[in-house]
Regions:
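Substrate-binding cleft and catalytic face of glycoside hydrolase catalytic domains
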Residues: 1-152, 156-162
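Catalytic-core region of carbohydrate-active enzymes that cleave or remodel glycosidic bonds
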Residues: 160-183
Length: 183
């Protein structure tokens, strides 16, 4: 994964976005070259999959997001710049993806795994707000990737649910990505 380290401390230092997204993309390029091409006294590992960040969708209140303390739009811009830069540098020799979504928990109890029947209710708990945020972030991200034809060779997500729920979420994700032309 390209991005920060996971911080469980109260005060977090590595969850703010980079100040210069282009510079960060170049740093990512150098990390990849270090691990795959031996650049800077590095290695020659056969690492093909490179994920851009981790859980930028963690919470609708960016100050409570333990992985990305910035707006969704800022993450989208980071992904846009980094994915294009890495594709230019490496072509199809690496797989570019992300964003390690917090998951599709809204799908868990839904009748329709296509995701087309989901609405947002008026009275929401903090968890409900987060779950809706996960979905909205996903929809916006996929829309950006498809509209702008950005590199997305794979999509990652997490779930800490029961196996049957995970299967429903996986089916939803696969169907949605296929419908968007990314399957």
């Amino acid at each position: 994964r390209l991005g920060h380290r996971i911080e469980h401390e109260i005060k977090k230092y590595g969850t703010l976005p980079p100040k210069d997204f282009k510079k960060w993309a170049i740093i990512c390029e150098h990390i990849i070259r270090h691990y795959t091409e031996g650049w800077a006294n590095g290695f020659r590992y056969n690492i093909q999959y490179w994920e851009i960040w981790n859980e930028p969708d963690g919470h609708p209140d960016m100050m409570q997001n333990g992985m990305w303390r910035a707006t969704p739009e800022e993450y989208f811009e980071l992904y846009r710049i980094t994915s294009k830069h890495l594709r230019t540098c490496f072509g199809d020799s690496i797989k570019i993806g992300g964003y390690a979504s917090c998951g599709f928990y809204k799908i868990k109890d839904a009748q329709d795994v296509t995701g087309e029947a989901f609405g947002i209710t008026n009275e929401l708990s903090d968890w409900d707000k987060r779950v809706n945020h996960f979905m909205n972030f996903f929809y916006q991200f996929i829309d950006m990737v498809t509209t702008e034809k950005l590199p997305l060779d794979f999509f990652t997500w997490h779930s800490y649910s029961q196996p049957a729920d995970n299967i429903r979420m996986q089916k939803f994700c696969e169907k949605y990505l296929e419908k968007a032309g990314l399957g």
